[in-house]
């Protein structure tokens, strides 16, 4: 990390109540570079005691933070936004070293992350109440919106900066305070963002970052009475557990969980646009996103032509360390992810699938996997039923519109789906039938700060981004005035 221009962004201690602290036990855990396996540094290994300390600090800070005007909070958030953009290169470098994604993608994520801070800083000034016409001339009915309170946020490793700002920015804009538990694979991004928040003048206790023992810290988040909302991005099994644990204190919940996104290409689609859209939807971040095209359904009439063009594009990818020029596919997060990709491919091949390209660990070894395409895939294979989270694209043949909609919906997940067709009636008809929280019609780059991100079914509850994402951090109060 010596190449960082601003070494103060590389923090190895947690951030609680405006102070950089070690665990009470002084214990640490190592953090490794997934591309090389080398140790980057360590983080302090905190547990329940420190998590409780952070929650109490957030609760104390809440009273003064929510008392500020929306404009006051916006000014501070916009200062944070500027600092994030000013430090794009340093933040991206930290991200690539600890997460693995190519440097160009990391820089894109920093800008994406900053957009949420700016959006919610401005949107926080447009939190409106209501006046309800009376049913009784002796009374008046007034509705106000108030911050929910202390928010606990558990964030993932695949987008280690954007998933923090997408949660923290609306919380702060609404007048809440936040305690963040980042993934142990990517803690330095979270700590760097906290350092910039400190420099921007966000008061002590308003943002806190606790690193270390996930289960202990998570248990405090779910059981502490002063935590009024839990927001989590991660796997569906962990989301179910957190929801269950929160039941004892009846918290507000936002869960952004797993996906199994279908991408449907009809025979009237623009083939080149569909291929490029599928490439982006499948291979961004080496396939490690919850909205990745997990199942690519292609109409029988164009299946062969699509497969040929798609494979040609996949074979052009440069795989390597994300710090190297021109690299488009970095490592997977760990060797377990490589093993999962291989197991899914082996299962599919054993049931009749064909490997069009890739299909094995990359010659670079370790956590690198070849961008892969499978043909002759069908619904009996595990790769159709599970979230892949790797650079493997299964191509599935279909002939009937109604049947492909049934296949696309045949999953417990409901996060994102994509449809390609030049028939506008078909686009609307199919999109309305798809049981997903988000549908891209002739588009796969669908996420930004102004639209609501989230799913249905076991892909979660709640929305992030947009005006709806701000409402997630507020409660409604009804006041009745007697005359």
Give the residues covered by each predicted segment.
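Conserved C-terminal structural/oligomerization subdomain of aldehyde/semialdehyde dehydrogenase
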Residues: 36-42, 227, 264, 318-319, ...
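Rossmann-like NAD(P) dinucleotide-binding subdomain of oxidoreductase/dehydrogenase enzymes
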Residues: 129-273, 398
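Structural signal for hydrophobic packing residues in well-ordered secondary-structure cores
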Residues: 62, 66, 81-88, 92, ...
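Hydrophobic face of amphipathic alpha-helices that form TPR/SEL1-like repeat modules
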Residues: 1-35
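ALDH superfamily catalytic-core signature
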Residues: 237-378, 441
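Residue-level signal for inorganic ion chemistry
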Residues: 37, 73, 95, 117, ...
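Glycine-rich loop-to-alpha-helix module at the N-terminal edge of alpha/beta enzyme cores
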Residues: 38-127, 138
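Short, well-ordered beta-strand elements within core beta-sheets of diverse protein domains
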Residues: 39-46, 61-67, 153, 263-266, ...
